[in-house]
Amino acid sequence: MNILVIGNGFDLAHRLPTKYVDFLEMIQCFKSITNEPNIMKAGGLDNIEKPIYAFLDRFIFEECALRGEFNKLIEDNFWIEYFLQCPMYQKENWIDFESEISNVIQSIDFDMKNNNLKLDDGASIVSNFYLEKFFLKRLSAAELGFGQDLHVSTFREMRDVLYQDLNKLIRAFEIYLCEYVENIDHMKISKEINSLGIDHVLSFNYSHTYQKLYDKSKNIKYDYIHGESRLNNTIESNNMVLGIDEYLNKKS
């Protein structure tokens, strides 16, 4: 049996925009367009030469239901705001989602342990600047009479908001992969890969690139180790996994 193990390098070798920075750049373009009244009123983009703009022109102006879902997923999402403000992303146009998520979780764990606080104690001490800024903004909105359900007063509530926003982020990434990445049709087939005679694919990707380009027989078995992207999923049914480092020791 010939088994092929693939990771994100496989998609990148086929020139697919599957890096996290590609996803963030799409979000920035999406926000710029949907927040511009004149463009929305015009009902379309004037320049769609770049593939991402051709996609957004269709996605925003023709697929209103999906656009609405996507907008709700990314709106006031802590993780998206955090990643976009991350110094590494702003300076070097690179980011590691898993590492940054781990950093935020560790900062909360540190705040609680260092100050002898528990989950149901008030989150009055927050050492992470971006975390404090984000929840202060939500608190200000609640005090003004907007979004009362967004008020966060305990570490437990903070944890729950971060978890909900993480699930929203993953679902938004799933839509990006299904609607944009998997509909790119100018990928080149590798003769070397095509001649391997693969029986089983173990994929650490969420996408279906090998299946789309090389599986002509439809007899190949697939295992998606970190889950796979499906457009008809919901936040609840999505099975894509974003992993983080195990930083707690056995005594913790």
Regions found by a protein language model. Give the residues of each.
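Extended, H/D-rich, highly charged conserved domains that either
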Residues: 40-252
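An N-terminal structural lobe/cap that precedes and organizes the functional/catalytic core
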Residues: 1-51
